[in-house]
Amino acid sequence: MVVIRAGSAADAAQIAEVQRDSWFGAYAGIIADEIIDRVTAVDGGARVRQSFRTRPWQRMIVAVPDGEDGGIVGYAAFGPETDVLGAPWPHPLSTDGEERRVAELYALYVRPPWWSTGTGRALMDRVLARSVAAGYSSVTLWVLRDNRRARRFYERAGFAPDGATNVLTGLGDVRELRYRQQL
């Protein structure tokens, strides 16, 4: 059982550790270990602290074990849908002329020992509830095409591929798929 709370810059080092552990667990055989090591070896805590300063639209939540003094075991980052540079899109108009607000799940990572414990689902439920409360009509996310475990998780949470794809050249030319859920 975990407690979900707002993340803060004070959590940056632990959030970066969760990301590193998750990448090595989830992306083994998809992204080369040397690439994961290179990408996550930089001072992740500083990178996360910077995102709190430079991405004011981003919301971060963390999962901590209930009743334990343990550290952060998972986190999610979300906010308005972003462009390829990570800046929020202006709110595009839907086909009927009404403003369409789209949220994006930027990241959801859980330490491997906490996989299949309900931690990821608790984070996802909070992201979806907060997106509804903020007035978003749908949520998107990007997932590596070959990350079958994550794709099953997102599909069980109500997401489906919407046809958009992207190639991450800096990570060894891996393909990612965009998933979407109407709220």
Language model features with spans:
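A residue-level detector for conformationally permissive "hinge/kink" positions
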Residues: 14, 110-112, 155
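Enrichment for repetitive, rod-forming helical segments
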Residues: 12, 26-27, 156-158
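Conserved N-terminal entry element of GNAT/NAT acetyltransferase domains
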Residues: 1-13, 177, 183
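C-terminal "cap" of GNAT-fold acetyltransferases
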Residues: 91, 102-103, 137-140, 144-183
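Charged catalytic carboxylate motif
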Residues: 14, 122-123, 149
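Conserved SAM-binding loop
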Residues: 4, 116, 143
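Hydrophobic pocket/interface hotspot
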Residues: 15, 19
